[in-house]
């Protein structure tokens, strides 16, 4: 059987890593050993931050809903509780979008929440 040298595979692997490290500062974009570490760490950060992004958006939606709710004389928790009691099933993403883009509709929802809290 013929001897196989791994030069082609090594070159391909090096090119792949250095391509991923393009735009990094200094040795991180030029030296293979350093680039491997940088690309690996970048992947770890990317994986972690895809999870964090979901949490951050939920926090942003809650802040926006709370601000709009307080303009209508309710706190965030009382608004959400009132909507649940009124059987209005609307998620925080959509509710925050309504609060920002359509205050009249949000006010109507807040009134329904208030009514269901008193009833």
Swiss-Prot record:
Domain of life: Bacteria
Gene3D superfamilies: 6.10.160.10, Ribosomal protein L20
Keywords: Ribonucleoprotein, Ribosomal protein, RNA-binding, rRNA-binding
GO CC terms in record: ribonucleoprotein complex; ribosome
Pfam families tied to this protein: Ribosomal_L20
Family according to the record: Belongs to the bacterial ribosomal protein bL20 family.
Protein role: Binds directly to 23S ribosomal RNA and is necessary for the in vitro assembly process of the 50S ribosomal subunit. It is not involved in the protein synthesizing functions of that subunit.
Protein name in UniProt: Large ribosomal subunit protein bL20
Gene name of the record: rplT
């Amino acid at each position: 059987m013929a001897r196989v040298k791994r030069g082609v595979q090594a070159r391909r692997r090096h090119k792949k890593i250095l391509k991923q490290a393009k735009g990094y500062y200094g040795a991180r974009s030029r030296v293979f050993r350093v680039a491997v570490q940088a690309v690996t760490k970048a992947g770890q950060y990317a994986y972690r931050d895809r999870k964090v992004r979901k949490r951050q958006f939920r926090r942003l939606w809650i802040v926006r809903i709370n601000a709009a709710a307080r303009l209508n004389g309710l706190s965030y928790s009382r608004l959400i509780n009132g909507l649940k009691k009124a059987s209005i099933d609307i998620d925080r993403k959509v509710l925050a979008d309504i609060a920002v883009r359509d205050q009249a509709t949000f006010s109507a929802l807040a009134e329904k929440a208030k009514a269901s809290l008193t009833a």
